[in-house]
Regions:
Chain C
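Short aromatic-rich membrane-water interface segments that cap or initiate transmembrane helices
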Residues: 67-75, 103, 174-183
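Short helix-perturbing small/polar motifs within transmembrane alpha-helices
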Residues: 2-60, 75-167, 192-205, 209
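C-terminal edge-of-domain segments
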Residues: 172, 183-186, 200-201, 205
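Non-cytosolic membrane-interface motifs at loop->transmembrane helix junctions
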Residues: 60-63, 105-109, 171-180
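Core mid-bundle transmembrane helix pairs that form the ion/substrate translocation pathway
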Residues: 214-215
Length: 286, 294, 215
């Protein structure tokens, strides 16, 4: 199994045949798609497409469980924000009146559009995180010539995040060994007690900074001076080659985006007026 | 052999510390020597290691007196990153030394800092991987391997930079006996095959005593004793007074020496001790009746 | 020959706030690898702590009822100057990403997070407030900067970002403004004071502590 930023992917996954730059490009470009698509059915189709890619990449789909509560709560917030908190608009069509609050059709429509936009954006990010190893992200950044210090800070930050999580477990176990546990306690209690975790976590990280710095210096790394201007071999890039298939994929993503823009602004596709989902929703609510 | 390290009347006091961590140290280390440094906790061993690598005074605040010269040049005179091409340090906590995603990246990092080309990196990578037996670990994250493997990775990562001086600060303190032996096996190979100057700071002397050409005793920041290894351990009373625990076999023979049963060279290994004991037993055994046949 | 002796008189416990922030004549404070490491570590800590807050107390779109990341953002910036500000600007991007906030929305939050990190760091240096919180004035400066910076963040993010992306109606913006503001200030009240009080004495003695902005 290969460990990605969000979990594990089997070693035989086809995703590893894709150059890390392509995955980064996919994230950056496809995240923009929903911004230009108003029709919910198209955005939902995009979301399903991304989920399909995750399945094809043999990602453990159970990773999505983490996001189910968040997706539901976000949807609730959007709908509440647009409907109950949507204000008084006599110019809108009244769809329902609940406990003295007017629920307008236009607000339901807008909430549906917004929610359908957010979902593929979220899953594009989840797809990237669940199919990219830490090394892939570094390689993607180095491929586009992002300065080494930036990529190295990013790599160290990921490493630090892992160590903080380990430290958190250790500190928590130490506290539990002292008979101190937050399980089953109230939220204010937990919040008070998490402060007791934060202090040793910070202290551990500060001590670690000195050790890390010594280790970097001992390996000849310098941030300033002549040593910092050494031309680096980027050995890790020798394990990855940008093949014709990667070029094709990159081109396909770019062309898809261009086609989207042309269809949207040139021919009016993906607009609300053409959405059969919105038409169906209106019929259903009437 | 020309001296590679020369320390002249060196003292270092950390800021906010009342007493110096090192006081009036004078030391010369020849190139190619394998030197062991021992001493109780707080004796200044790590401070000495950091002083040789330039971490002191560049990374720590304090007051320095005297000079620490590597290849005839003061450590402070080396530009940032230059001294580390000559002096490599392996720290006691391998976890704290890893900043890369895979073992291979960890091994390569130092070489990239030196500005080596891809073919050179590949060649050295192959060499250290074989030396430290890391071939099957290259793709693994360094924090997911065992303690002994981690320390071998740390050792190999520094070795790949081919420093002229390698300093190992308690490299086996967090390891089990088997892992400890494997690390020392690498050091044995290094001593036999390379001409690096190797300085090992250790508490556990079982493996160190047989490898070191010279030994140094530090206590309370002062250099109490420095000598060729056999002669060093002859001063057993001084070592015991300063909380040093020589290998059990050596101590045993020393007791025999004190009792007058043995008066020759102190053994450094169990095999040598067994040979000593055999000699003692042979001398003590009463002559038996002459054997007759027939 | 004595070298590298910082001429800070007395033990750290007796240092005044003025002395903490002042660079003595002849004192060398080079920018070094330690600062890069601090930057990376703060991003790492913030990533974990911020994601915890984002996942545990979500309002939506990365806005949280109780955002624990504020502690790393503001305390880190006070201690480590520009490195802390940079870390405080960057890490929410990652913690929000893991919590499911879309890429470009997280990116658009950057100015809010930058101000939230910068203002306490600037105020402590400009007004020579003691990071160990020795007097009422120090507490007041911290509280004021927490409130002002979170207010900016609360106005920028829901108003400019979320409204700009069309994710909120005008009428629901106040909920998110108060959610952002309250989520930061309350978490800051819980964590910032205690962290500064407990650890500043140790941090100011380390070579990573930043007196000016870079070193």
């Amino acid at each position: 199994m290969n460990k990605t930023l969000l979990g594990y992917v089997p070693e035989q996954s086809p995703i590893y045949a894709v150059h890390p730059f392509v995955k980064l490009f996919f994230l950056l470009v496809v995240s923009l798609f929903p911004m230009f698509i108003a029709s919910p059915e198209w955005n939902l189709a995009l979301m399903l497409f991304i989920l399909g890619l995750m399945w094809l990449s043999r990602v453990d789909m159970r990773v999505l469980r983490i996001y189910v509560p968040m997706v539901i709560s976000m949807g609730s917030v959007i709908f509440l924000s647009y409907t109950v908190l949507g204000g008084v608009h006599p110019e809108f069509g009244l769809a329902a009146r609940i406990a003295g609050v007017n629920i307008y059709w236009e607000r339901i429509r807008d909430a549906s559009v917004v929610y359908a936009r957010i979902l593929p954006m979220i899953f594009t990010m989840v797809f990237f995180l669940s199919t990219s190893r830490e090394r892939d992200v570094i390689v993607a950044m180095r491929s586009v010539r992002i300065p080494f210090v930036v990529t190295y800070v990013f790599a160290m930050a990921l490493r630090a995040a892992g160590m903080v999580l380990e430290d958190f477990q250790i500190v928590r176990q130490a506290e539990q060994a002292r008979g101190f546990d937050t399980a089953g306690k109230s939220i204010p209690y937990r919040i008070r007690k998490y402060v007791m975790y934060m202090i040793p976590l910070f202290a551990l990280s500060l001590r670690r900074s000195e050790e890390f710095a010594n280790a970097l210096l001992a390996r000849g790394y310098a941030f300033t001076g002549e040593a910092s201007r050494v031309k680096r071999a980027d050995y890790v890039l020798t394990h990855y080659s940008f093949r014709p298939a990667d070029l094709l994929l990159t081109a396909a993503i770019g062309l898809a985006f261009a086609a989207l823009l042309v269809l949207r602004f040139g021919f009016g596709y993906f607009e609300l007026e053409r959405s059969w989902f919105i038409a169906w929703l209106k019929t259903a609510l009437d | 052999m020309a001296p590679i390290i020369e320390i002249q009347n060196y003292s270092w006091r950390y800021s906010y510390a009342k007493m110096p961590a090192l006081n009036g140290i004078n030391l010369i280390i020849e190139e190619g020597a394998f030197v062991g440094i021992i001493g109780p906790n707080g004796s200044g061993k790590t401070t000495l290691a950091y002083s040789l690598d330039g971490l002191i005074p560049s990374q720590y605040r304090g007051i320095k007196q005297g000079a620490v010269n590597i290849l005839g040049r003061e450590v402070e005179a080396y530009p940032a990153g230059a001294l580390q091409k000559l002096v490599g340090v392996v720290f006691s906590d391998p976890e704290a030394q890893f900043t890369a995603m895979t073992v291979e990246d960890e091994l390569v990092f130092g070489m990239e800092n030196l500005g080596l080309s891809v073919p050179e990196i590949r060649e050295r990578l192959e060499w250290v991987t074989e030396l430290a037996e890391l071939g099957h670990l290259l793709e693994k994250p360094p924090y997911e391997i065992s303690g002994g493997q981690k320390q071998r990775v740390a050792l190999a990562a520094v070795l790949a930079m081919t420093p002229r001086v390698m300093i190992l600060d308690e490299p086996t303190s967090m390891l089990d006996p088997v892992s400890r032996k494997r690390v020392f096996d690498v050091l044995v190979r290094l001593k036999e095959e390379q001409r690096n100057t190797i300085i090992v700071i250790e508490h556990n002397l079982e493996n160190l005593a047989s490898l070191a050409d010279r030994m140094i005793l530090l206590s309370n920041g002062e250099l109490l004793l420095e000598d060729e290894t056999h002669a060093f351990f002859e001063k057993m009373d001084l070592l015991l007074e300063n909380g040093i625990h020589p290998p059990g076999a050596m101590l045993f023979i020393h007791r025999l020496m004190q009792e007058g049963y043995y008066a020759s060279r102190l053994p450094l290994t169990v095999d040598e001790a067994a040979a000593c004991l055999t000699e003692v037993v042979a001398r003590l055994k009463p002559p038996g009746p002459a054997s007759s046949r027939g | 020959m004595a070298t590298h002796a910082p001429s800070i008189p007395g033990a750290p416990g007796k240092m005044t706030a003025e002395q903490i922030w002042s660079v003595e004549a002849g004192e060398r404070r080079p920018v070094g690898v330690i600062h890069i490491v601090i930057l990376a570590l703060l991003i790492g800590i913030g990533f974990v702590v911020g994601a915890f807050g984002s996942i545990s107390f979500p309002l939506g779109f990365g806005v949280n009822f109780f955002w624990t990341g504020i502690a790393v953002q503001q305390v880190g910036a006070i201690w480590f100057g520009a490195w802390g500000v940079l870390a405080g600007t960057i890490f929410p991007f990652f913690s929000n990403a893991v919590a499911g906030t879309p890429f470009y929305i997280s990116l658009a939050y950057v100015p809010a997070n930058a101000v939230q990190a910068f203002l306490p760091a600037w105020a402590f240096r400009f007004f020579k407030a003691d990071p160990r919180l020795q007097s009422g004035r120090d507490y007041l400066i911290l509280l004021a900067t927490m409130i002002v910076s979170s207010a900016f963040g609360a106005l920028w993010s829901p108003l400019v970002v979320l409204r700009g992306f069309g994710l909120l109606t005008t009428e629901s913006v106040p909920l998110f403004i108060w959610g952002w503001f309250g989520g930061n200030v309350i978490a800051g009240l819980v964590f910032n004071f205690i962290l500064l009080k407990a650890l500043s004495g140790v941090v100011i003695r380390t070579p990573s502590f930043v007196k000016r902005w870079l070193s």
